[in-house]
């Protein structure tokens, strides 16, 4: 409830000349916040996700707002995106990761212990079923269809106008 005496860890640098090329938050001390250099999306699952200011908000040449409005809008967009994303990940990332882990573990278990043994069993039994089905077809269904075909082959229709 007074004046803040601590130095801020995050600063946003926006120049009049380079505001349109700037799309992320610059840290005051990059080494302090640096990740271990590991790519967090090595399989490019979210490569289609475009959340930069220029990807979301654009003004055509014919309609431009004031430069200061554009700069402030850009800064507020980046700050709010940064803060809200961090806030949401603090509260949602761990529970959602836990739920996704449970779902994928359950699906993996079902696939490994139920679905694949069932499929393999069906594939093992199918040649026998195919042989039995062919025998039933040849012994029962083929003679029945042949008899029905012979009965209907002797039917003749004559149309006449009276």
Curated annotation (Swiss-Prot):
Pfam families with a match to the protein in the record: Caveolin
Modified-residue entries (Phosphoserine), positions: 20, 23, 36
Keywords per UniProt: Cell membrane, Cytoplasm, Golgi apparatus, Membrane, Nucleus, Phosphoprotein
Intramembrane residue segments, as ranges: 87-107
Predominant subcellular localization, coarse grouping: nucleus
Membrane topology, Cytoplasmic segments: 1-86, 108-162
Gene Ontology cellular-component annotations: caveola; cytoplasmic vesicle; focal adhesion; Golgi membrane; nucleus; perinuclear region of cytoplasm; plasma membrane raft; sarcolemma
Gene Ontology MF term list: D1 dopamine receptor binding; molecular adaptor activity; protein kinase binding
Subcellular location: Nucleus; Cytoplasm; Golgi apparatus membrane; Cell membrane
Positions carrying Phosphotyrosine: 19, 27
Its membrane topology: Peripheral membrane protein
PROSITE patterns (UniProt xref): CAVEOLIN
Post-translational modification: Phosphorylated on serine and tyrosine residues. CAV1 promotes phosphorylation on Ser-23 which then targets the complex to the plasma membrane, lipid rafts and caveolae. Phosphorylation on Ser-36 appears to modulate mitosis in endothelial cells. Phosphorylation on both Tyr-19 and Tyr-27 is required for insulin-induced 'Ser-727' phosphorylation of STAT3 and its activation. Phosphorylation on Tyr-19 is required for insulin-induced phosphorylation of MAPK1 and DNA binding of STAT3. Tyrosine phosphorylation is induced by both EGF and insulin (By. similarity).
Signal peptide per UniProt: none
InterPro entries per record: Caveolin, Caveolin_CS
Homology family: Belongs to the caveolin family.
Description of how the protein assembles with itself and partners: Monomer or homodimer. Interacts with CAV1; the interaction forms a stable heterooligomeric complex that is required for targeting to lipid rafts and for caveolae formation. Tyrosine phosphorylated forms do not form heterooligomers with the Tyr-19-phosphorylated form existing as a monomer or dimer, and the Tyr-27-form as a monomer only. Interacts (tyrosine phosphorylated form) with the SH2 domain-containing proteins, RASA1, NCK1 and SRC. Interacts (tyrosine phosphorylated form) with INSR, the interaction (Tyr-27-phosphorylated form) is increased on insulin stimulation.
Function statement: May act as a scaffolding protein within caveolar membranes. Interacts directly with G-protein alpha subunits and can functionally regulate their activity. Acts as an accessory protein in conjunction with CAV1 in targeting to lipid rafts and driving caveolae formation. The Ser-36 phosphorylated form has a role in modulating mitosis in endothelial cells. Positive regulator of cellular mitogenesis of the MAPK signaling pathway. Required for the insulin-stimulated nuclear translocation and activation of MAPK1 and STAT3, and the subsequent regulation of cell cycle progression.
Protein name per the record: Caveolin-2
Organism listed in the record: Carollia perspicillata (Seba's short-tailed bat)
Lineage per the UniProt record: Eukaryota, Metazoa, Chordata, Craniata, Vertebrata
Gene: CAV2
